[in-house]
Amino acid sequence: MRNTDKRWDMIFMSHTLEHIVNPCDFVRKCEKMNTRYFFIEVPTFDYKLSNEPFGMFCEEHVNMFTLESLQNLMNECGYQLVSADFNINVTSKLPAGSPAMKTIWEKPFKKKYQFINNSKNILCEYINDSENLLAEVRKRIAEIDEKKKLAIWGTGHHVSMLLANTDLLDKNIVKVYDSDRRKYGQKLNGCEIGAFSENDIIQGNVQAILLATYTAQDALEKILETYQNKVEVIKLY
């Protein structure tokens, strides 16, 4: 962080702290430039949807916070909590950024407020629910006929998780689709990544399509409605 003699009444930090390797050291450096208030917005682990893919909250994040853990951090750095609001959008399907909490902190630290929630219990419950969901996903993939010509639609970190934790590699993968043109020409499991082509279905080159994405699953399913009698569409969630 650049040295400066300037000081601000409020520091505003939105969806930043989860990317910082040493958040305590970072906040302490910010504190030297701050006279009173600190606004922090981060994804929260206090509320997680257990029907999300296992661990998909971790996209480029090196830290995950509950209000309890964030309070411990900010108290250590000389701040006390003024207010906290939780934004829970159950239809967003963006595990990496939602739900989120918006908090305001004030210095100097005077009193710590004790919350009933327990971060360890929340984490254990999340792991238990997610392992149950992953077992269902494994079962669905195991049921895919190994003789069928399978296309995978989606090449993000979610499909990497599937390749590592299921027997997807044992299937007859012949095509890989993605909507991101920047990935075209690259390979996944020996197949070149490209755009979806209806000719693959019409010509019989693809017999089943696995929707290997959580955030875009509904949108892709709608695209494939036209071909529902010609190709098997496999959803995981």
Regions flagged by a language model, labelled:
Residues 1-55, 59-79, 105, 177-184, ...:
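Conserved SAM-binding loop
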Residues 39-41, 83, 151-152, 235:
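A structural signal for short, well-ordered beta-strand segments and their strand-loop junctions
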Residues 47-48, 91, 160:
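Generic structural signal for helix capping and beta-alpha/helix-loop junctions
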Residues 78-80, 231-232:
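Charged, glycine-enriched surface loops/patches
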Residues 79-90:
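Conserved S-adenosyl-L-methionine
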Residues 88-93, 104:
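N-terminal juxtadomain amphipathic helix
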Residues 97-237:
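Hydrophobic, well-ordered beta-alpha structural blocks that scaffold small-molecule cofactor pockets
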